Amino acid sequence: MNLNSIPAFQDNYIWVLTNDEGRCVIVDPGEAAPVLKAIAEHKWMPEAIFLTHHHHDHVGGVKELLQHFPQMTVYGPAETKDKGATHLVGDGDTIRVLGEKFTLFATPGHTLGHVCYFSHPYLFCGDTLFSGGCGRLFEGTPSQMYQSLMKINSLPDDTLICCAHEYTLANIKFALSILPHDSFINEYYRKVKELRVKKQMTLPVILKNERKINLFLRTEDIDLINEINKETILQQPEARFAWLRSKKDTF
């Protein structure tokens, strides 16, 4: 399997997973034009689309792509039924695409129906987890998002986090505002800054490394707890997550 990315809009990535025969699955095509261009250039044969949630920048290109490739199956949660999904999927489902088994799990928070697709080592997590951050809570609660992140955090160390936006630099700046002396975060900041100066993408990221630099995955880390305790005493990791998310919302 080969992982490819197509830039879209200002900071989106549309992921395309291909096999050796050129058959492919397209993840969250927010617009069709760049996908059609890449398909023509690489002579890919689209077999399926994965949708993680219903937001327009993730589903906007589905109907046009289906006009060109009507044989495709479009997998998505119930909230994407009116956005082009032809096969509804949910928590615990498994599907076979490109000869590989993908496991679905619900990750409510950003939206209530958000799902992720996992076939080791690839995790297509939409707007649930970003490098250095997590999605805004447009529909769900902090508790729901925390539990969703813990599902991701339980995956193998070598999981490749294929999220949908290039938010890494801004997220790491936020992390440094909370833990300015953290060596891992500072090192990652230098690396990410250099990549972005060169207009290079910072994704995908390996979960093992993400656990070191993403504060939203470190809610039981003593350094972070001590920092939060300077402002407020929060006993539960979910409460510390909510505190972080609130801080990020106004950063």
Curated annotation (Swiss-Prot):
Catalytic activity, as annotated: an S-(2-hydroxyacyl)glutathione + H2O = a 2-hydroxy carboxylate + glutathione + H(+)
Membrane-spanning ranges: none
Highest taxon listed in the record's lineage: Bacteria
GO biological-process terms attached to the record: methylglyoxal catabolic process to D-lactate via S-lactoyl-glutathione
SUPFAM superfamilies: Metallo-hydrolase/oxidoreductase (SSF56281)
Pathway(s) this gene product operates in, as recorded in its UniProt entry: Secondary metabolite metabolism; methylglyoxal degradation; (R)-lactate from methylglyoxal: step 2/2
Gene3D superfamilies, per database record: Ribonuclease Z/Hydroxyacylglutathione hydrolase-like
Protein name, as recorded: Hydroxyacylglutathione hydrolase
GO molecular function terms noted in the UniProt entry: hydroxyacylglutathione hydrolase activity; metal ion binding
Described purpose of this protein according to its UniProt entry: Thiolesterase that catalyzes the hydrolysis of S-D-lactoyl-glutathione to form glutathione and D-lactic acid.
UniProt key word Lyase: no
Taxonomic lineage from the root: Bacteria, Pseudomonadati, Pseudomonadota, Gammaproteobacteria, Enterobacterales
Catalytic activity, EC: 3.1.2.6
Family, per entry: Belongs to the metallo-beta-lactamase superfamily. Glyoxalase II family.
Co-factor binding comment: Binds 2 Zn(2+) ions per subunit.
SUBUNIT field: Monomer.
